[in-house]
């Protein structure tokens, strides 16, 4: 099973059209089973941004595209447009024993994220149904703070409750975006993978536009960082010794 995670596309003022066209070519060549887009498909939540982004996303030759809104998609009441252009299901059984569950963290007129009591309870009850499968939880906002990103006021405000529910539910992998900073936290039985920005001009530090490639084989999960037009590297290598990538 092969899954691609795109994040923080930011179609609009920050968008790099040439980079995303390269992403389309690379993903189509990779031919994944699914593409997960963890939020901020647009920059300001405007209708014309949704239309332009939809046109580009439709060039991905994949059977399953799972998209969820980010805080930028909620701007200017853009959440009213989201499901029209990017309809999605919260529970996605991909086959081969892999299930992807999405939760919403974006809220109107807020840059921070929140899951809420009811959605957290739903998450726990839902994951119990799939405890014998490989479970992937996808959201926009980062669940845990990420190094080199300054103030961490924009994490999920109820992150402690969500993390507890995630661990109790034996989720195998959490996919996040939001911070434009690739990173991975490894809690032995739980991996939390943060994607960088796929196509925004607002990259952090020495990082480039990138996306993640997730491989699930025999119940084991591997997450690789793929620089657009560049190399593919295990995401865990960056967390272990990311200074090495700066030297490159």
Which positions does each model-derived feature cover?
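N-terminal active-site segment of His-dependent metallophosphoesterases
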Residues: 1-56, 125
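Beta-strand-turn-beta hairpins that frame and shape the catalytic cleft
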Residues: 1-4, 92-102, 128-134, 187-192
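Active-site neighborhood of phospho(di)ester-bond hydrolases with catalytic His/Asp-centered motifs
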Residues: 6-7, 35-40, 64-71, 104, ...
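Active-site environment of divalent metal-dependent phosphoester hydrolases
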Residues: 12-15, 43-48, 71-79, 108-111, ...
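Extended active-site neighborhood of metal-dependent phosphoesterases/phosphodiesterases
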Residues: 47-129, 161-167, 213
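Short acidic, glycine-rich surface-loop motifs adjacent to enzyme active sites
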Residues: 130-147
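Conserved beta-sheet core of the metallophosphoesterase superfamily
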Residues: 151-222
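A short C-terminal boundary segment appended to hydrolase-like catalytic domains
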Residues: 216-248
